[in-house]
Design a protein with these regions (language model features):
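Conserved, structured core segments of small domains
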Residues: 31, 108-115, 119, 123-124
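Short alpha-helical hairpin
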Residues: 16-21, 120-126
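Short, contiguous alpha-helical
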Residues: 29-78, 124-156
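Short, helix-capping/interhelical loops that line the mouth of catalytic, cofactor-
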Residues: 2-5, 56-103
Length: 156
């Protein structure tokens, strides 16, 4: 059974700084402890979580698909249980092309800062791309759990 660790708060300045400090420890040659992504693809993959909120570049699920996401995926994403290594991911999260390390790193840090600065009030009760309305806590968990999982994957 996987241990549930205390989740960082995506809206807390100190917790955001901790994430950025971990990101700063990555280099273009940092290798994963598990999985197939290189470090630039991993950061691009993490950026998708923020793109779904801030950019209008991913089609929104509709009808039956959205219902299935809310019923079967939402709790895994916004709940406290950690992700498993090598778990399944949505198609929009699969990064097939090569990415530039510095570009993806800057995007990720910018998204982290934007999220922290917008804060809990902005997100509380806001509709998400795939899961309907979320609480501020659910938004924070969604952002921080995914990022923590992949930073841990790369040993930082």
């Amino acid at each position: 059974m996987e241990k549930i660790k205390k989740m960082k708060n995506s809206f807390n300045e100190h917790d955001t700084a901790e994430f950025i400090s971990r990101i700063d420890k990555l280099t273009p040659t940092t290798n994963p402890i598990w999985g197939k992504m290189d470090v630039a693809k991993m950061m691009a993959h993490c950026n998708v979580t923020y793109e779904l909120e801030y950019e209008n570049i991913h089609p929104k699920p509709k009808g039956f698909v959205k219902l299935m996401l809310k019923l079967f995926v939402k709790n895994a994403v916004v709940g406290p249980k950690p992700y498993k290594k090598n778990g399944q991911t949505g198609s929009q999260f699969i990064i097939k092309d090569s990415r530039k390390f510095e570009t993806e790193k800057k995007r990720l840090v910018d998204y982290l800062n934007k999220t922290q600065q917008l804060g809990e009030t902005y997100f509380d009760g806001k509709e998400s791309h795939s899961f309907g309305v979320l609480t501020a806590q659910e938004w924070s968990t969604m952002f921080s759990k995914h990022l923590d999982h992949h930073l841990t994957q790369f040993g930082v």
